[in-house]
Amino acid sequence: MEVILLERIGRLGQMGDTVKVKDGYARNFLLPQGKALRANEANKKKFEGQRAQLEAQNLERKNEAQAVADKLNGESFIVVRSAGETGQLYGSVSTRDIAEIITANGFTLHRNQVELNHPIKTIGLHEVSVSLHPEVQVKVMVNIARSTEEAECQAKGEDLTSIEAIYGIEEQPLSEEVFDDEDEAEDQA
């Protein structure tokens, strides 16, 4: 099915482009969301008549998104979850969880705007892309930890999944520290 795009859509094209997409994608996503019109003569004339208005609305939305992006860019958000000793989460952190945390911190965000290839399943610092507008994207840090104290340690750069951090071992003892005497070391061997 051929459609006329009413806004920029990644991997498809810019506003005003006539592109061919699969019927299901057009019927189930593009047309109901108001992101495209069917490419027939009546809709082409309608689009050309409203093009200036649509471009102005798109520019306004882009400017609003850019203002939010300036505040949001580089921000760090803490997510507290249960995890095992090795740092594996009991469950995962998904786009919905990240959107809820960002919204709880005063930003308006929908989970579809969070771009995550797969759910996060380990503690640590994770960089996540947020698409506020098709042309405006920002990166935020999501600090996933077992507690807020642990999150502060991770923010300082400490690795909480290493053996030293898990068991409280600072360094391995040297053989001279274990055995008082070289003779004892030889007797033990």
From Swiss-Prot:
Q: Which GO terms describe its cellular component?
A: ribonucleoprotein complex; ribosome
Q: Could you confirm whether the keyword Membrane appears in this record?
A: no
Gene Ontology MF terms: rRNA binding; structural constituent of ribosome
Q: Report the InterPro entries cross-referenced here.
A: Ribosomal_bL9, Ribosomal_bL9/RNase_H1_N, Ribosomal_bL9_bac/chp, Ribosomal_bL9_C, Ribosomal_bL9_C_sf, Ribosomal_bL9_N, Ribosomal_bL9_N_sf
Q: Which Pfam families match?
A: Ribosomal_L9_C, Ribosomal_L9_N
Q: Which UniProt keywords apply?
A: Ribonucleoprotein, Ribosomal protein, RNA-binding, rRNA-binding
Q: Which residues form a coiled coil?
A: none
Single Gene Ontology BP annotation: translation
What the protein does?
Answer: Binds to the 23S rRNA.
The family this protein is said to belong to: Belongs to the bacterial ribosomal protein bL9 family.
This protein is called: Large ribosomal subunit protein bL9
From which source organism is this entry?
Brucella melitensis biotype 2 (strain ATCC 23457)
Q: What is the lineage of its organism?
A: Bacteria, Pseudomonadati, Pseudomonadota, Alphaproteobacteria, Hyphomicrobiales
